[in-house]
């Protein structure tokens, strides 16, 4: 009944991943991002992560697997997803939705910390403002984007972009793979400490 649809969806997902893998710059960007994060942790820094919708879930997933565990038991790493509902509703109400992440970065971000901003379009105003706040604090910035990078293109120390122009879910599927690989590489880097 739906076998063709299922095959088409899985084939499109595989094709999106294959296209991402073709560009060697993506492999290097993932490695640079992992080393940047591990270096921050080794120096006493932390990572703040943010995004909207499914990207917000990815930001929380990233922080959870750093503070908790991924595949192996190891010490937790300092990671905070900007996901506190009371903060988001307060700032959204009092300052506007575009400020929900930047206010948090202004409050707890420090020089030497890292911001991971996730946006499939690269045009999320609240993530862009968080990047600006992170820069003002002397933080490093990593972005996970899609399509042409949108307004976030060129704003990060490391941008990992999925150049897919279809639905956002295909971009998110690559983002979660990248997040898992980042955690794996961070764990390897932290053992070197």
UniProtKB/Swiss-Prot annotation:
Additional remark text: The reaction produces a racemic mixture of D-glycero-alpha-D-manno-heptose 7-phosphate and D-glycero-beta-D-manno-heptose 7-phosphate.
Enzyme superclass (EC): isomerase
Keywords for the protein's UniProt record, in alphabetical order: Carbohydrate metabolism, Cytoplasm, Isomerase, Metal-binding, Zinc
Family note: Belongs to the SIS family. GmhA subfamily.
Family matches, as Gene3D superfamilies: Glucose-6-phosphate isomerase like protein, domain 1
Sequence ranges assigned to domain SIS in this UniProt record: 37-193
Domain of life: Bacteria
CDD domains reported for this sequence: SIS_GmhA (cd05006)
UniProt GO MF annotations: carbohydrate derivative binding; D-sedoheptulose 7-phosphate isomerase activity; zinc ion binding
Name by which UniProt lists this protein: Phosphoheptose isomerase
Subunit structure: Homotetramer.
Functional summary from the UniProt entry: Catalyzes the isomerization of sedoheptulose 7-phosphate in D-glycero-D-manno-heptose 7-phosphate.
Organism: Cronobacter sakazakii (strain ATCC BAA-894) (Enterobacter sakazakii)
């Amino acid at each position: 009944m739906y076998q063709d649809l299922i095959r088409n969806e899985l084939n499109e997902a595989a094709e999106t991943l294959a296209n991402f893998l073709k560009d060697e710059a993506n492999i290097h960007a993932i490695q640079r991002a992992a080393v940047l994060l591990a270096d921050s942790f080794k120096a006493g820094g932390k990572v703040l992560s943010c995004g909207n919708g499914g990207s917000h879930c990815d930001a929380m997933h990233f922080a959870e697997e750093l503070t908790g565990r991924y595949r192996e038991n190891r010490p937790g790493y300092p990671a905070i997803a900007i996901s506190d509902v009371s903060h988001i509703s307060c700032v959204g109400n009092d300052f506007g939705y575009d400020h929900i992440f930047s206010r948090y970065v202004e409050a707890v971000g420090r020089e030497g910390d890292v911001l991971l901003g996730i946006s499939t379009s690269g045009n999320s105003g609240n993530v862009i403002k968080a990047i600006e706040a992170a820069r003002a604090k002397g933080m490093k910035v990593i972005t996970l984007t899609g399509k042409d990078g949108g307004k976030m293109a060129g704003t990060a120390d490391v941008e990992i972009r999925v150049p897919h122009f279809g639905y956002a879910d295909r971009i998110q599927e690559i983002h979660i793979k990248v997040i898992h690989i980042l955690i794996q590489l961070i764990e390897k880097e932290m053992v070197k400490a």
